[in-house]
Swiss-Prot record:
Belongs to the CDP-archaeol synthase family. GO terms for biological process: glycerophospholipid biosynthetic process. The gene is carS. This is CDP-archaeol synthase. It comes from Saccharolobus solfataricus (strain ATCC 35092 / DSM 1617 / JCM 11322 / P2). Keywords: Cell membrane, Lipid biosynthesis, Lipid metabolism, Magnesium, Membrane, Phospholipid biosynthesis, Phospholipid metabolism, Transferase, Transmembrane, Transmembrane helix. It comes from the Archaea. Catalyzes the formation of CDP-2,3-bis-(O-geranylgeranyl)-sn-glycerol (CDP-archaeol) from 2,3-bis-(O-geranylgeranyl)-sn-glycerol 1-phosphate (DGGGP) and CTP. This reaction is the third ether-bond-formation step in the biosynthesis of archaeal membrane lipids. The chain crosses the membrane at residues 7-27, 55-75, 78-98, 116-136, 138-158. Disulfide bonds: none annotated. The keyword Phosphoprotein does not apply.
Length: 166
């Protein structure tokens, strides 16, 4: 196979994670996953931006993408996409946890972490499930995530979906 084919395939493989990660901002309010609890440092675990409702929407949208992908590949892509979406959201929550420990409020910016936390979470489960991803596919997805995150967040800001352009 060609490198171009491999890069296009990597987009398809990571599409559930991208969709899951991008669906969260559409939920404006909800029950915080951390139930408003603080960590031992007195700061919130994740903050109000990580909600059960957002998680459900992310899992639903990401898994729906997997159902569509499974029509072209194998039925196991439904399960893979559910787990990929879940781990992408876990990666996103770990990113929020790290930001709270650093004293960065919800909506605060940490270049790199904001764009790649969900990719790292999704990559973990994809590797554990033995989905074949090459190093250049992974690097391509990281670069794509970095630039797409910047662009889509700016558009979401212009559309008043997000409060900040990052």
């Amino acid at each position: 196979m060609s490198i171009a084919y491999d890069l296009l395939l990597s987009i398809l493989i990571y599409l559930p994670a991208f969709v899951a990660n991008g669906s969260g901002p559409f939920i404006k309010r909800g029950t915080p996953i951390d139930f408003g609890k603080n960590f031992v440092d007195g700061r919130r675990l994740f903050g109000d931006g990580k909600t059960f409702e957002g998680l459900i929407v992310a899992l639903t949208f990401g898994t729906t993408v997997g159902v569509i992908i499974s029509k072209f590949f194998t039925a196991e892509w439904t399960l893979i996409s559910f787990l990929e979406s879940l781990f992408a959201m876990i990666g996103d929550m770990i990113g929020a946890f790290i930001k709270r420990r650093l004293g960065i409020p919800r909506g605060g910016r940490v270049l790199g972490l904001d764009q790649l936390d969900f990719v790292l979470g999704a990559s973990l489960i994809l590797v554990l499930m033995r989905v074949n991803i090459t190093w250049y596919q992974f690097l391509f997805i990281c670069g794509l995530a970095f630039f797409l995150h910047q662009g889509t967040n700016y558009v979401a800001y212009l559309l008043k979906i997000k409060n900040v352009p990052w």
